[in-house]
Structure formats: structure tokens, C-alpha cells
Amino acid sequence: MENYSSLLIGGKQFSSRLMVGTGKYKSTQDMVASLSNSETEIITVAVRRIKNDQTGENLLEKINWEKYWMLPNTAGCVNSDEAVRIAILGRELAKLSGQEENNFVKLEVIPDKKYLLPDPIETLKAAEILIKKGFAVLPYINADPILAKRLEEIGCATVMPLGSPIGSGQGLLNLSNIRIIIENSKVPVIIDAGIGVPSEASQAMEIGADGVLINSAIAQAANPPLMAQAINYSVKAGRQAFLAGRIKKQDFAVASSPEKNISI
């Protein structure tokens, strides 16, 4: 049987299906402890934060880059030109951290400041450019099955449909479209944004997602390290449940005890 924790992205294998963000933590200590408890191997880093913020430089120093694979993201970019420029800077940051072969980028193009919804047209445009430049592109998108398939066809390493708006904690609001994306996709589907509690992370895995990316649910919890551990367990449980196969839903009851040959 397939190992529940085996995940292949861009030719690189990972033993965890949980990706974790590095923003919004109250302290560096909380972040480091949460990363450890999550057992993640892929962590997202906002390139603009590292480039412009002194605490960003501290972030590079505080994380053991021999243990974690950096996933630079283009958060804050509002068009494809900005996203391409920041992605290139992100690749250089990965090299500075010792990951010479790291060409991953989490592509975010978000002009909408209120709901932080991704721009599908600019995302597709940026993805095409970055793929030609040798990037393994992990695009953050709305739960749009047509866009997801188009991004797969041009060579994206994954597709990352949102569960609900970033940081909203509303869970998986568009399950029908997410299911279609999972059913049609030949690349890993990572649910990104909106997950608020472990049960929602488990639900994403139970319906067949290949992984989840979580930041706010951990970083803004009352006890981030404990929440990271809980979500870690839920992702593993959800994956195992998917592989095990759930019973069919029915409109009537089915007795679990035998109805024949019962001795009294």
C-alpha cells in the first residue's frame, strides 16, 4: 500500500504532507517550536519580508535549512511582472540558505487587498514565464477546475486551490470544485488558505488532497506549537482515511450485527 506520507513535488520527495508558513507568529520561539511539532519539511517564506524587514534576515538565521526545504512565495505581488521579479529573488535566497538546487516558488498574485483573492489571469501569465525560467511553480489559485487544469498543462509542479480566503479560518467552502480539481489533476493538489482547525485539515486529506499548507491556524492559535502538533496528526489521519476508503453514504440504516443464524 502507498505510504501515507510520501509526496513528490518537482522531482523531490517529501515525507510530510503538511506545509507550514512562517508569518504571523508572536515570537521566533513559537515559530521554531511549531515547525518542529508539525514535522513539516516544506516551509513558506515571504521574499518581500526577508528583503525589506530586518526580522526577515533573522528568520533566515533562526531556521535550520538543512532540515527544511524553503518555499519562497511572492506574497504582496499584484501583477505578473512583480511576481516574476520576486520569484527570482526568492531563488537567490534559497541558494544563500545552502539550497543550491532549489527552484521552487509559491506563486501568489493578489491585487485584491480586502479578500486577498488571487488574480487568475496574471497568475497564469507569471506561471508561464517562470516555468520557462526553470522554476517549479506552485500556484495559489481560486478553486477553479479549468484554471487548475490549464496550469497543470503548462507545467506547474502542483496546483494550490484555496479552501477559503487567506487567514479567514472559514474552512473548505467550495468542496464541490475542490473535488473536481482533485479528480482531474495529474499533479499534486495542495489545499492552501482558510483552514482553521485540525478537523478541516483532515477533511481536505480525506477527500483526496495530496497535502495542505497552513499558516494562520497555527501561528494565531492560543498555543501555536500545540496546534501545529494537532494539525500534524490530523493530516496523517486524513491521509490514512483516504487510503483506507470510507463506507458509502446511504439514506437508510444498515445493521452491523448479523441478522441470520443468531443463537439465543
Swiss-Prot record:
Catalyzes the rearrangement of 1-deoxy-D-xylulose 5-phosphate (DXP) to produce the thiazole phosphate moiety of thiamine. Sulfur is provided by the thiocarboxylate moiety of the carrier protein ThiS. In vitro, sulfur can be provided by H(2)S. Pathway: Cofactor biosynthesis; thiamine diphosphate biosynthesis. Its EC number is 2.8.1.10. GO terms for biological process: thiamine diphosphate biosynthetic process. 1-deoxy-D-xylulose 5-phosphate binds at G167, A193, G194, N215, S216. The active site is at K106. GO terms for cellular component: cytoplasm. It is found in: Cytoplasm. It is an enzyme of class 2 (transferase). CDD domains: ThiG. Homotetramer. Forms heterodimers with either ThiH or ThiS. It comes from the Bacteria. Keywords: Cytoplasm, Schiff base, Thiamine biosynthesis, Transferase. Belongs to the ThiG family. This is Thiazole synthase. InterPro entries: Aldolase_TIM, Thiazole_synthase_ThiG, ThiG. GO terms for molecular function: thiazole synthase activity. Its main location: cytoplasm. It catalyses: [ThiS sulfur-carrier protein]-C-terminal-Gly-aminoethanethioate + 2-iminoacetate + 1-deoxy-D-xylulose 5-phosphate = [ThiS sulfur-carrier protein]-C-terminal Gly-Gly + 2-[(2R,5Z)-2-carboxy-4-methylthiazol-5(2H)-ylidene]ethyl phosphate + 2 H2O + H(+).
